[in-house]
Amino acid sequence: MASEKSQNVQDVFLNHVRKSKTPVTVFLVNGVKLQGIITWFDNFSVLLRRDGHTQLVYKHAISTVMPGAPIQLFDATKPEGDLGRDTAAYSDE
């Protein structure tokens, strides 16, 4: 068995946009569009900051998260399927 932790693409994606402070557009299942920077997330929710205000958004209400700039999650030098990112810390705090 490999000693590396298995990482899911959702955590890798959210951690990447959080660490890089990439602006995102979050579309909710009811059609509402939210924009801001993800400052924290866990298994059930995301904190989204914009203009000094923070919103707690529950993941079950999210349809799509679209980054405001192109991102690269996968390291082309690593084997296919290796996300190559550390997701141990999910907060900027």
UniProtKB/Swiss-Prot annotation:
Matching InterPro entries: Hfq, LSM_dom_sf, Sm
Keyword RNA-binding attributed: yes
Known role: RNA chaperone that binds small regulatory RNA (sRNAs) and mRNAs to facilitate mRNA translational regulation in response to envelope stress, environmental stress and changes in metabolite concentrations. Also binds with high specificity to tRNAs.
Family: Belongs to the Hfq family.
SUPFAM superfamilies: Sm-like ribonucleoproteins (SSF50182)
Gene that encodes it: hfq
Gene Ontology MF: a single term: RNA binding
Protein's UniProt name: RNA-binding protein Hfq
Ranges for domain Sm: 11-71
Annotated keywords: RNA-binding, Stress response
GO terms for biological process, alphabetical: regulation of DNA-templated transcription; regulation of RNA stability; regulation of translation, ncRNA-mediated
Domain of life: Bacteria
Statement: the UniProt record of this protein carries the keyword Protein transport: no
Subunit-level organization: Homohexamer.
Assigned GO CC terms: cytosol
The organism of origin for this protein: Granulibacter bethesdensis (strain ATCC BAA-1260 / CGDNIH1)
